[in-house]
């Protein structure tokens, strides 16, 4: 759990207080909607539900306070706004946020619109502004989204949370590997250095000093792994590989 004072939050592990930004009002966060289509075929009573198994992203509006420590200084407003844009990575890419009211979780967000400033000038050194962000449907436990866990050649892994997990695996070494998680087996051939298996994005790739290369052709499988909620699965692997690691990504719905 991260220690945060009321109003504070983390953006990519940087505390908002370092940029003099606080959450003024706790936001309303709606539960993610199931991605479904309802059809009413001719001659059929009622409707049919087509469900693709996923959830929609949720839009959230944040009301924030920036306190620059200066009193009624119009010349500083441009600098303050630029610092705010930079802190939230405006228009660039997804960022990780941990709010004070949910310090065990990481929210994956992107800023969808430019901030709206409620006042055009500083009032006692402060500005109030609003942000509209889009949040992924799942929030992740802080100690399971970045840390690699070593996986022995034979053992059990329990998912203690109420949502299924789709981990990220990393295979280190050279050669071939057979690996089974639960009842699903994946076969890897010709591993050179490393291979990553992203079970959320359904993607197998190699990472060579930050250069990502598609490696789906090195994997044989009917499906990607997942670890069911509140259940244990057996994990076994064998082959010429030296190390297998996992970022478990325990998660809950928003």
Which role does the model predict for each range below?
Residues 141-254:
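Intrinsically disordered, low-complexity segments enriched in serine, threonine, and glycine
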Residues 30, 96-140:
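Short beta-strand and beta-hairpin "edge-sheet" elements
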Residues 15-24, 106-113, 186-192, 215:
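Short amphipathic beta-strand/extended segments with alternating polar/hydrophobic composition
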Residues 54-58, 87-91, 123-127, 161-163, ...:
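Solvent-exposed loop and beta-edge segments used for protein-protein assembly and interaction
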Residues 1-40:
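Polar/acidic, low-complexity leader/linker segments enriched in S/T/G and N/D
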Residues 1-7, 88-94, 172-175:
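A short, compositionally biased
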Residues 65-112:
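Short, acidic/charged, Gly/Pro-enriched secondary-structure junctions
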Residues 39-41, 45-75, 125-139, 232-233:
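Oligomerization/assembly interface segments of phage tail-like spikes and tubes
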């Amino acid at each position: 759990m991260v220690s945060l004072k009321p109003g504070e939050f983390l953006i990519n592990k940087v505390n908002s207080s370092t940029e003099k930004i606080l959450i003024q009002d706790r936001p309303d966060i709606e539960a993610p909607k199931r991605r479904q289509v309802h059809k009413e075929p001719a001659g059929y009573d009622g409707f049919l539900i087509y469900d693709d198994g996923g959830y929609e992203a949720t839009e959230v509006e944040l009301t924030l306070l920036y306190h620059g420590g200066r009193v009624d200084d119009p010349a500083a407003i441009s600098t303050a706004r630029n610092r705010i844009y930079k802190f939230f990575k405006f228009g660039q890419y997804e960022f990780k946020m941990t709010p004070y009211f949910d310090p065990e979780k990481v929210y994956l967000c992107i800023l969808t619109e430019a901030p709206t400033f409620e006042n055009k000038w500083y009032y006692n050194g402060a500005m109030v502004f609003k942000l509209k962000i889009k949040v992924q449907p799942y929030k992740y436990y802080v100690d399971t989204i970045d840390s690699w866990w070593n996986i022995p050649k034979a053992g059990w892994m329990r998912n203690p949370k109420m949502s299924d997990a789709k981990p990220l695996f990393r295979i280190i070494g050279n050669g071939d590997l057979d690996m089974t998680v639960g009842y699903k087996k994946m076969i890897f051939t010709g591993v050179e250095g490393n291979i990553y298996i992203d079970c959320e994005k359904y993607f197998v790739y190699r990472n060579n000093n930050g250069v990502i290369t598609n490696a789906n052709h090195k994997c044989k499988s009917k499906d990607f792994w997942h670890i069911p909620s509140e259940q244990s699965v057996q994990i076994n692997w064998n082959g010429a590989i030296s190390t297998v690691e996992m970022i478990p990504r325990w998660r809950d719905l928003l």
